[in-house]
Design a protein with these regions (language model features):
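Ribokinase/PfkB-type carbohydrate-kinase core domain
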Residues: 1-278, 290
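Short amphipathic alpha-helical face segments that pack within enzyme cores
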Residues: 281-289
Length: 290
């Protein structure tokens, strides 16, 4: 990252300047039973419940030296990832942050016209804030990325556009709707536990390779609980592909959307040991293809 005096440094050298915002995360494995009084619930698939203590995330203070370094060294930055707006609740503050971000993106493009601006969606604490964010920043980004829960929430609950995330063709059409609605420049990435896919125009980068890297790093983290080492990623290569991912791959390949869709099945884990930070690992993996 970039220090306050503008140097590129390892994160170990950075000092904390704000109060920590601990997350309380309760993981549930597929088949677990939760008992509340006389009620009993069986977990249908591995997931987690996150209870967030809001501190600095509610304001998202920007480090100006970080943005300045990227703008001054844009030719060295092949992709520029935007995220972390999801805990903001004040629309005026969000507008201020987004306007700054749009100016930053414009400056980055001047220094690197081929650079990829990548926006990772999240679970927002306010629907109105999420709408403002997507509608403001969407046209400035090359790729908008989200998981299938966010695809479902955005189209079915926020905009009543309609998508069935259990149907891969509906999901492809949903990704196309996302791109159209927000004016995303190149395409949309959808990532799930069974597959990941890119829907949009052809890229100079090998996005299929990026999706593979993303899937492997996310699965390695699900299997080990931390960012996968080379040896741990090698272990994941021995896993088989899941039925849903393979079925979706074949369906897309035979569909009218085959030319504009790249789908990669994930290595299958029925009961992952960990379900935290998998999206972040996926996004990190994808960046390697740029």
């Amino acid at each position: 990252t970039v220090s306050q005096d503008g140097r590129l440094v390892h994160t170990d050298e950075i000092r904390q300047t704000n109060e920590q915002g601990p997350h309380f995360i309760i993981q549930f494995k597929k088949g677990d039973k939760i008992c509340l009084g006389a009620q009993e619930m069986v977990i249908p698939c591995s997931n987690r419940l996150i209870i967030t203590k809001i501190t600095v995330n509610e304001f998202v203070p920007f480090s100006k030296p970080y943005f300045r370094w990227i703008e001054q060294n844009a030719s060295l930055v092949s992709s520029n990832v935007l995220s972390s707006f999801n805990a903001l609740l004040n629309p005026e503050l969000l507008k201020e942050r987004l306007n700054f971000t749009k100016e930053h993106v414009a400056a980055y493009r001047v220094g690197n016209p081929e650079g990829i601006v990548f926006f990772e969606d999240a679970h927002f604490h306010s629907i109105d804030v999420k709408k403002l964010c997507l509608e403001t920043i969407g046209a400035s980004v090359d790729i908008l990325s989200m998981n299938e829960e966010e695809l479902n929430h955005t189209l079915n609950h926020m905009y009543q556009e309609g998508v069935d995330v259990e149907d891969i063709i509906s999901s492809v059409e949903g990704a196309k709707s996302i791109r159209r609605m927000f004016g995303v420049r190149k395409g949309v990435v959808i990532h799930t536990k069974d597959y990941s896919m890119y829907v949009g125009e052809p890229l100079k980068a090998d996005i299929e390779r990026g999706l593979i890297y993303g899937n492997l790093l996310a699965t390695a983290k699900a299997n080990n609980g931390w960012y996968g080492t080379k040896e741990q990623v090698k272990e994941v290569l021995e896993f088989g592909f899941g039925d849903r991912g393979m079925k979706n791959y074949q369906t897309v390949r035979e569909s009218k959307y085959a030319e504009e869709t790249v789908l990669v099945p994930s290595k299958y884990m029925d009961k992952p040991k960990f379900t935290i930070g998998l999206g972040d690992s996926f996004v990190g993996g994808v960046q390697m293809c740029f």
